[in-house]
From Swiss-Prot:
Family affiliation: Belongs to the purine/pyrimidine phosphoribosyltransferase family. PyrR subfamily.
UniProt record, GO biological process: DNA-templated transcription termination
Protein name: Bifunctional protein PyrR
Alphabetical list of Pfam families matching this protein: Pribosyltran
Subunit and partners: Homodimer and homohexamer; in equilibrium.
GO molecular function, a single term: uracil phosphoribosyltransferase activity
């Protein structure tokens, strides 16, 4: 893959998450009854960062959990057409709560659909919202994010790579040309 550009550096990611945190607070008129659920891998640390920002702004903790979606078959080379839920972990009830799913990149929406199904199978929330760091287009399902860090229209030959300190040792979002 050939690097085209760096879309967000560590400071830009931090500013973006602060903005998303403010938008969540404003839209929900506070943070009462809000639960953040990160879509593993990179959605979970993003959800934790948003929760930390919200606590700093509002002075209230927000519960954070995760849903683990399997995107690959056992050989780890072929992406599944229909992602499946591996596990969901949230230590609080989501019944009648406002659940905000958090993911790094919104692409085909299949992962988000699987996460929505997992949340609905767990319990009946008041509603589900979606926050993403990057929306790159190419949706296959009628799902849109309520909170978007950055809209990046891409071609199908481009790859968006989100790197986070918690997993990759650095914070950045880069776009690559995939060489087929």
């Amino acid at each position: 893959m050939e690097l085209k550009s760096t879309l967000l550096d560590d400071k830009a990611i931090k500013r973006t998450l602060i903005r998303i945190s403010h938008e969540i607070i404003e839209r929900n008129k506070g943070v009462e009854d809000i639960v953040l659920i990160g879509i593993k891998r990179r959605g979970y640390p993003l959800a934790q960062r948003i929760a930390d920002q919200i606590e700093g702004i509002e002075g209230r903790k927000v519960d954070v959990g995760y849903v683990d979606i399997t995107l690959y078959r056992d050989d780890l080379t072929i992406v599944e057409k229909d992602p499946t839920v591996k596990s969901i972990d949230i230590e609080t009830s989501i019944k009648d709560k406002k659940v905000i799913l958090v993911d790094d990149v919104l692409y085909t929406c299949r992962t988000v659909r699987a996460a929505i199904d997992a949340v609905m199978d767990l319990d009946r929330p008041e509603g589900i919202q979606l926050a993403v760091l990057i929306d790159r287009g190419h949706k296959e399902l009628p799902i849109r994010a309520d909170y978007v860090g950055k809209n990046i229209p891409t071609s199908k030959n481009e790859v968006i790579k989100v790197m986070l300190n918690e997993i990759d040792g650095e914070d950045s979002v880069k776009i690559y040309d995939s060489i087929n």
